[in-house]
């Protein structure tokens, strides 16, 4: 899976270091390896996009290293592969030594895994399951400003799934903890890999059941009901949060217009 890049190799290049992405000119590099001074570097083939290979290279380019969020407006498939590259680069960087015996590890040749020759332990990339839910009450949707979003963006509620918890239980718990309300009629919508740093978002829609909004100030700045045709600043297109909000708006329009 890992090999040395040759002069004629071409495709999309995910050059990553410490969860950063090389973005010369603000774009994901695409083309022949020689044009990006990548010949001779180690590369991992991580997929294909539009008939061309996508490669992950672990390297700090010092200049033009940016965030994956800068390519959020790319096609979802390419964004997903870039996220895969960043997560794999960080996985290999953080698993140089075995967590059980402390001996050096090496990469598997057959799968994305790190192996310990001493104690035979095998490690895989970590994925953190999360829930994200759009809650509707008649013609309004519950939107909140999170403490980590200081840019005025209002979004739906979300949180990590705890050990020994189902996705449905996680929705009920997170909604109650963050807003103080209960929901019903929970429906699965879609999922989205979200490499910030290693989440898998599972998206739901739900209806308001009962309760008054009581904001958890550790998590949220504000939370309120917003009529579907009078919404505040929303998450950018391409995010599953935006998809949930737009789907809820479409349902409200169909019912109230």
Swiss-Prot record:
Transmembrane segments: none annotated. Substrate binds at residues 69, 111, 124, 192-199, 241. Pfam families: NUDIX, Zn_ribbon_NUD. A motif (Nudix box) lies at residues 159-180. Keywords: Hydrolase, Magnesium, Manganese, Metal-binding, NAD, Zinc. One of its GO terms (biological process) is NADP catabolic process. It comes from the Bacteria. A divalent metal cation 1 binds at residues 158, 178, 219. InterPro entries: NAD-cap_RNA_hydrolase_NudC, NudC-like_C, NUDIX_hydrolase-like_dom_sf, NUDIX_hydrolase_CS, NUDIX_hydrolase_dom, RNA_Hydrolase_NudC, Znr_NADH_PPase. Divalent metal cations. Mg(2+) or Mn(2+). Belongs to the Nudix hydrolase family. NudC subfamily. HAMAP family: Nudix_NudC (MF_00297). mRNA decapping enzyme that specifically removes the nicotinamide adenine dinucleotide (NAD) cap from a subset of mRNAs by hydrolyzing the diphosphate linkage to produce nicotinamide mononucleotide (NMN) and 5' monophosphate mRNA. The NAD-cap is present at the 5'-end of some mRNAs and stabilizes RNA against 5'-processing. Has preference for mRNAs with a 5'-end purine. Catalyzes the hydrolysis of a broad range of dinucleotide pyrophosphates. This is NAD-capped RNA hydrolase NudC.
